[in-house]
């Protein structure tokens, strides 16, 4: 009955654990090549996974904190942002959580700012591929690369990530603590955007999604031999 239920699914998407899935595929391939009696039923053909209906998962924001401003003064950084964004200072004491796509919050020097991508730029992105309209890609293209000289978020130690489950107060705490210069709050990627990227055979940018619910941490051993 379970097999029949899964056979009726048109698609299954890997939402989290891409590297582990790829590693499991490589292990399977190696074992299959060494096993002359390979049947496809051996334990190395399988790995543990949990499936959720897309209607029962949430994608939270995945925010950024920045070590420095690439040598810029705060005023110069804000001026650089104004080339591609409408920049508006927030109300004192109120955090800026983005409420729509192409909107960002910036916490710097004790103040919050709301950044909105300029309309002409947002319109031009509609003709590009599925990843171009993602807010994490917009942040990379118009803030991190040209202004801060951060080109690879996975390897650059000048940027770190804070899951939305920890709230915007965690961003303030990290910046006010003195170890970081600024924080960027990001609008959460929609499920529809994620599926659109996957269906077009593209790859989501790094640290673009924070999924909930998450399974409890633990250790399970899968013996292959």
Tell me what each language-model feature is.
Residues 1-225:
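Surface-exposed, charge/polar-rich loops and edge strands
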């Amino acid at each position: 009955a379970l097999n029949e239920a899964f056979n009726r699914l048109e698609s299954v998407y890997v939402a989290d654990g891409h590297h582990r899935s790829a590693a499991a595929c490589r292990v399977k391939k190696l074992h299959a090549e060494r096993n002359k009696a390979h049947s496809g039923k051996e334990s190395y053909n399988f790995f543990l996974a949990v499936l959720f209906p897309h209607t029962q998962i949430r994608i939270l924001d995945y925010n950024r904190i920045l070590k420095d401003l690439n040598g810029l003064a705060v005023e110069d950084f804000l001026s650089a942002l104004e080339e591609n964004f409408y920049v508006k200072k927030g109300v004192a004491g109120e955090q800026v959580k983005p409420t729509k796509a192409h909107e960002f919050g910036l916490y710097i020097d004790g103040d919050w700012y709301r950044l909105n991508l300029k309309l002409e730029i947002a319109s031009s992105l509609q003709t590009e591929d599925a990843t171009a309209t993602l807010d994490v890609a917009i942040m990379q293209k118009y803030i991190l690369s040209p202004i801060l000289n951060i080109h690879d978020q996975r390897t650059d130690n000048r940027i770190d990530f804070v899951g939305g489950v920890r709230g915007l107060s965690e961003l303030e705490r990290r910046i006010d603590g003195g170890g970081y210069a600024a924080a960027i709050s990001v609008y959460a990627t929609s499920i529809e955007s994620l599926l659109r990227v996957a269906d077009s055979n593209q790859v989501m940018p790094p640290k673009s999604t924070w999924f909930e619910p998450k399974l409890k941490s633990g250790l399970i051993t899968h013996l292959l031999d």
